[in-house]
């Protein structure tokens, strides 16, 4: 049961964050790599509207604030798809896309397929995804359930679950609280065998730059679908 709970938690919080293949997956899902990092160069891709006349990618040193340090024009290689290959080791840098149409220049965006962002999610981050994988990640599989009627489900909000001063947990209100043995033990004592986790992706309503200010939201205002919510991390300024 412990393994079932842990794997259910991982599936609920992390399943969307580390897929890197561009081919069709075994479950029929399609993935898209917006950013592919290497020490020699980083490849960027963006699916932009057909009315786009040009797309630029802006590189920043900071996840928030500061001026852009480089701008690169992207090339249209297929219908609605734009690419750019930026030379050099960009790990630790941040980026945004900016689309131009015949009528106007759009606001900068991290892109809907960003997997890591700076504080408050306005800029995407260049990271090495392989470095973020915990041991055994590639072999992880979701637990099998014979029938949905066998499920005893507990609904969990990351912050609410562990934020109480009496919780006895070290990482109160954080993702890491669910890795603490006491947290898993508590869930087991409830008699549940599945966890329904409320939104874990990056949402807009909590200011991640103010971690010491009490803030709360259920999370149904998504900002970056494929990025973990920064306010649940131990340091939202470190994308990896």
Predicted feature residues:
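Short proline/glycine-enriched turn/loop motifs at strand-loop junctions of beta-rich domains
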Residues: 47-54, 157
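Conserved, mostly hydrophobic/aromatic
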Residues: 46, 97, 156, 197, ...
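A conserved hydrophobic secondary-structure block that centers on an alpha-helix together
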Residues: 159-195
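Aromatic- and acidic-residue-enriched carbohydrate-binding clefts of CAZyme catalytic domains
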Residues: 167-177, 207-240
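Bacterial Sec-dependent N-terminal signal peptides
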Residues: 1-21
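Carboxylate/His-rich catalytic cores and anion/metal-binding grooves
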Residues: 187-212
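The feature marks proteins involved in alpha-glucan
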Residues: 17-43, 73-155, 160-173
């Amino acid at each position: 049961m412990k393994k079932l709970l842990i794997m259910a938690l991982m599936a609920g919080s992390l399943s969307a964050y580390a897929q890197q293949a561009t081919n069709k997956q075994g479950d029929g899902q399609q993935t898209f790599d917006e950013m592919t990092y290497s020490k020699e160069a980083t490849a960027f891709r963006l699916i932009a509207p057909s009315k786009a006349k040009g797309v630029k990618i802006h590189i920043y040193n900071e996840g928030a604030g500061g001026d852009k340090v480089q701008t690169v024009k992207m090339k249209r290689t297929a219908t609605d798809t734009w690419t750019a290959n930026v030379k050099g080791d960009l790990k630790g840098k941040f980026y945004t896309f900016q689309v131009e149409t015949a009528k106007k220049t759009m606001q900068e965006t991290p892109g809907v397929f960003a997997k890591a962002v700076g504080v408050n999610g306005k800029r995407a981050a260049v990271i090495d995804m392989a470095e973020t994988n915990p041991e055994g990640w590639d072999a992880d599989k979701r637990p099998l359930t014979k029938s949905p009627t066998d499920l005893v489900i507990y609904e969990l909000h990351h912050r609410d679950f562990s934020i109480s001063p009496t919780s006895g947990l070290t990482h109160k209100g954080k993702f890491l609280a669910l890795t603490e043995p006491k947290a898993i033990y508590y869930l087991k004592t409830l008699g549940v065998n599945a966890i329904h986790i409320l939104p874990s992706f990056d949402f807009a309503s909590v200011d991640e730059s103010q971690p010491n200010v009490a803030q709360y939201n259920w999370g149904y205002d998504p900002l970056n679908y494929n990025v973990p919510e920064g306010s649940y991390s131990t340091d939202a300024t470190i994308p990896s």
